């Protein structure tokens, strides 16, 4: 079916797609458009060889989806005078008067993000905590840090807060790195550091490397966005909180579609989206167990459980008798050696079932099980369901 150009909604996307969260928003928008379109989408940031799209009033488009993190984008939305959905806007005090009241607003639940980070570290036995915010102390960064610190303090611990950068430090990472490195060195170790975003988490890792702090054993680092281009390229790989930004993009497109169709009747919506989960990588795989034998055994298990190692391999690595190591495990209240091997493997199995399309045979091999039949039996005993049903329920 053909469409005249004038009949196809012209939608501007006001966000920079060099960030994972923004790319996920775009994917959510595209998913909606594939089902309910067509739309003609215009990425306002521009690409090499094309201009930016900011004179939206003269452009004559139909609607806008914008991540409003600066006044330039905010004023562009105001000038356009078309339906818009705003995502994660900065403080209202920094925006043109009336902007937020005029459009639907979707935002990540910053409090839930900070609390998830705190719970993650508390469950791992940390007693020393710190937060490193975004360099400009933007509102979402402050909210994440405040929620993180509040949850840590409710648990009875203090939380160090890093910030107050100079103008020079905001412009030049090398200028800031020494101060951040020195600050990290002064924290009681082992310390759990929550960074406001993946790019900031990468800088924390760089600062640790500069002064010889071991990650994750001296400093465990968790960030936000789960940008694989960043997280998988750091040393060690960076653990990160995955946000529900794809869903947010889909919902933004749905609300904009409704507003474009029923401009004077569409209901203004305000909604927050909680984070999905923590994606654990090496930067937080610290072993916070006082017993050094148990700590060495756990680290060996976590690093090698994807291979078909058994209890004798763990005992051989620690270089003590099996009886002594099992006794230490019981005293540390972490179950038996075999319990930990199986728990670690099943955790990996569940992640691969939910996040990949690999066959059960391939997953069994990748998680250290000798056969898919044995894995199936163990999985049913542990979770009361089959792997097929578990995967189907997670879509």
Question: Which residues make up each language-model segment?
Answer:
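Binding-interface segments
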Residues: 375
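A secondary-structure capping/hinge motif
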Residues: 329-337, 378-390
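Bacterial carbohydrate/catabolite-sensing allosteric modules
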Residues: 1-65, 71-317, 322, 326-327, ...
